[in-house]
């Protein structure tokens, strides 16, 4: 796929490696200065706090994957091939999901490697519980990134301009995330139907309280499916049914 051959992909991987190195180094110095002990699982538990960087990369890639073809005037060359438009759209969608997965995989493999390098391999009973909770959080974060990617693909197909698609994606997605917190603050039950109220499945762990009363894991799965279908259908229609003008 062309996306994996773009310089931005290589640059992103290099930046992630550099970022993980300095993050591990800083946390190691903090641990030493505090006179405490830490292991690689403890370090790994810190890394999801910067999930916003991976989400941002996913949004940018998804929001430009179609619109970039219009910006570069290559969309007609893509569509004159003996392949139906819908197959091109599905290939773009699969690429977004795969790239998001590979970004997370690369990020956390690097986190694991630097965690082992700086903090060693010792594991305690508490560490195992922490690892399970961390993996659950990583899974929820990736699911949220995929949903953001689907919306970015919708914007990319709708606006057909990279700058507009990226800006709208960021404004709407992070605005919606803020709206969830506001509705939670005012205890508005309609907030439970918003996308970002349902992407964090760690809220259903034992001892945790759901964002809104009445929410269950099945409810959240249903809301996510509805949003995903809506994003995909609208994106598909914009890409497959509208006339191509460049």
UniProtKB/Swiss-Prot annotation:
GO cellular component, one term: plasma membrane
Transmembrane segments: 7-27, 50-70, 99-119, 135-155, 163-183, 219-239
Membrane topology: Multi-pass membrane protein
Source domain of life: Bacteria
Any single Pfam family the record assigns to this protein: ABC2_membrane_4
Tagged with keyword Chloroplast: no
Localization in the cell: Cell membrane
Keywords: Cell membrane, Membrane, Transmembrane, Transmembrane helix
Protein name per its UniProtKB record: Uncharacterized membrane protein YdbK
């Amino acid at each position: 796929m062309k996306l994996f051959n773009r310089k931005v992909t290589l640059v992103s991987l290099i930046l992630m490696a550099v970022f993980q190195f300095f993050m591990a180094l800083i946390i190691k110095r903090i641990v030493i200065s505090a006179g405490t002990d830490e292991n690689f699982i403890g370090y790994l538990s810190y890394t999801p706090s910067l999930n916003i960087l991976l989400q941002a990369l996913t949004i940018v890639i998804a929001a430009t994957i179609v619109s970039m073809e219009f910006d570069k005037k290559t969309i007609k060359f893509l569509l004159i091939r003996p392949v139906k438009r819908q197959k091109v759209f599905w290939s773009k969608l699969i690429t977004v999901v795969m790239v998001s997965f590979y970004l997370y995989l690369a990020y956390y493999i690097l986190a694991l490697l630097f965690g082992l390098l700086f903090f060693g391999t010792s594991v305690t009973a508490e560490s195992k519980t922490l690892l399970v909770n961390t993996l659950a959080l990583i899974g929820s974060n990736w699911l949220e990134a995929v949903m953001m990617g689907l919306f970015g693909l919708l914007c990319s197909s709708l606006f057909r301009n990279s700058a507009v698609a990226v800006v709208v994606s960021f404004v709407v997605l992070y605005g919606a995330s803020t709206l969830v917190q506001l509705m939670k603050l005012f205890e508005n039950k309609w907030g439970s139907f918003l996308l970002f109220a349902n992407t964090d499945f760690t809220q259903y762990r034992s001892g945790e309280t759901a964002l809104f009363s009445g929410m269950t894991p099945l409810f959240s799965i249903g809301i996510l499916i509805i949003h995903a279908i809506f994003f995909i259908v609208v994106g598909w229609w914009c890409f497959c049914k509208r006339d191509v003008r460049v």
